[in-house]
């Protein structure tokens, strides 16, 4: 199994494209992470919108550059709105990304996420336990936390990518991105990133935005992982703990965009 590495030049090129296109991202995400997700997208130069009412969600999915479906705080009314948005995204050819939060631990969201797979997501982003559960390999995870190493989920990610046509991202100490055939590994980041709620969910929003860019989608999505890990490393170097990490992280994302424009 060959795992390729993403070049810094490719990551920088994708970030330049990201800033040029400034994707409008329709984030149907969980209640816990909305502010952090929006600020992450803004720091990178995208435009976030959190539209959840069923009638509006369908309408907005048609005009957005990309759609994110995150099931972290799933309810039946929210599921109805997400269905409507995904159906409209499919009709409008709007790329959409699925973040199957805790799909291995809870039955209702597992059934819902499996239903959404029939609508062919453009990308799927989860931790190892979530990806393995979605692929039908195992049911696991400790709530939203993984109990598996990312590398162990690569075969499941490849299977899921081939079955759905999606770019699949498995996040962990090393992130792995696959289209079912090629695999790209992204190293970096810091364990402190796991002590702040929302870094994974925010990454899913950036992945969604990258799916709206021209070029090689696998490399574009891998670039999203690279930016987040880069920013995490820079932020940790300036932080004293989780509380000071968040503002430094947002600053680091912003600085990355300034560097590629210089």
Swiss-Prot record:
Q: Which of this chain's residues are annotated to bind ATP?
A: 125, 171
Q: Which cofactor does it need?
A: Mg(2+)
GO biological process terms, alphabetically, are: thiamine biosynthetic process; thiamine diphosphate biosynthetic process
What is the organism lineage in this UniProt record?
A: Bacteria, Pseudomonadati, Pseudomonadota, Gammaproteobacteria, Enterobacterales
Give GO MF terms, alphabetically. ATP binding; hydroxyethylthiazole kinase activity; magnesium ion binding
Give the matching SUPFAM superfamilies.
Answer: Ribokinase-like
Report the pathway entry: Cofactor biosynthesis; thiamine diphosphate biosynthesis; 4-methyl-5-(2-phosphoethyl)-thiazole from 5-(2-hydroxyethyl)-4-methylthiazole: step 1/1
Q: Which family does it belong to?
A: Belongs to the Thz kinase family.
Give the residues the record marks as binding substrate: 50, 198
From the UniProt record, list the reaction(s) this protein catalyses: 5-(2-hydroxyethyl)-4-methylthiazole + ATP = 4-methyl-5-(2-phosphooxyethyl)-thiazole + ADP + H(+)
Keywords attached to this Swiss-Prot or TrEMBL record, sorted alphabetically, are: ATP-binding, Kinase, Magnesium, Metal-binding, Nucleotide-binding, Thiamine biosynthesis, Transferase
Q: What does this protein do?
A: Catalyzes the phosphorylation of the hydroxyl group of 4-methyl-5-beta-hydroxyethylthiazole (THZ).
Q: What is its EC number?
A: 2.7.1.50
Give the species. Shigella boydii serotype 18 (strain CDC 3083-94 / BS512)
Q: Does the keyword Transferase apply?
A: yes
What name appears for this protein in its UniProt entry?
Hydroxyethylthiazole kinase
């Amino acid at each position: 199994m060959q795992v390729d590495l993403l070049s810094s030049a490719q990551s920088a090129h994708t970030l330049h494209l990201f800033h040029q296109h400034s994707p409008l991202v329709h984030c149907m995400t969980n209640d816990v992470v909305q502010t952090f997700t929006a600020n992450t997208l803004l720091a990178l130069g995208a435009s976030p919108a959190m539209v959840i009412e069923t009638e509006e969600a369908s309408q907005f999915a048609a005009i957005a550059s990309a759609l994110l479906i995150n099931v972290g705080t799933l309810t039946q009314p929210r599921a109805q709105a997400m269905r409507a948005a995904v159906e409209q995204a499919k009709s409008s050819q709007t790329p959409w990304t699925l973040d199957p939060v805790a799909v291995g631990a809870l039955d209702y969201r597992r059934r819902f996420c499996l239903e959404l797979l029939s609508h062919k997501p453009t990308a799927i982003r989860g931790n190892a336990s979530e990806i393995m559960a979605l692929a039908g390999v195992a049911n696991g995870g400790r709530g939203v936390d993984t109990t598996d190493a990312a590398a162990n989920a690569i075969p499941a990610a490849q299977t899921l990518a081939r079955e759905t046509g999606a770019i699949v991202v498995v996040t962990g100490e090393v992130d792995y991105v696959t289209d079912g055939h090629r695999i790209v590994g992204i190293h970096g980041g810091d364990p402190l990133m796991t002590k702040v709620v929302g870094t994974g969910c925010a990454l899913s929003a950036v992945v969604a935005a990258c799916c709206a860019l021209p070029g090689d989608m696998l490399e574009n999505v891998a670039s999203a992982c690279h930016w987040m890990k880069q920013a995490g490393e820079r932020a940790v170097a300036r932080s004293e703990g989780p509380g000071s990490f968040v503002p430094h992280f947002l600053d680091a994302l912003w600085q990355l965009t300034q560097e590629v424009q210089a």
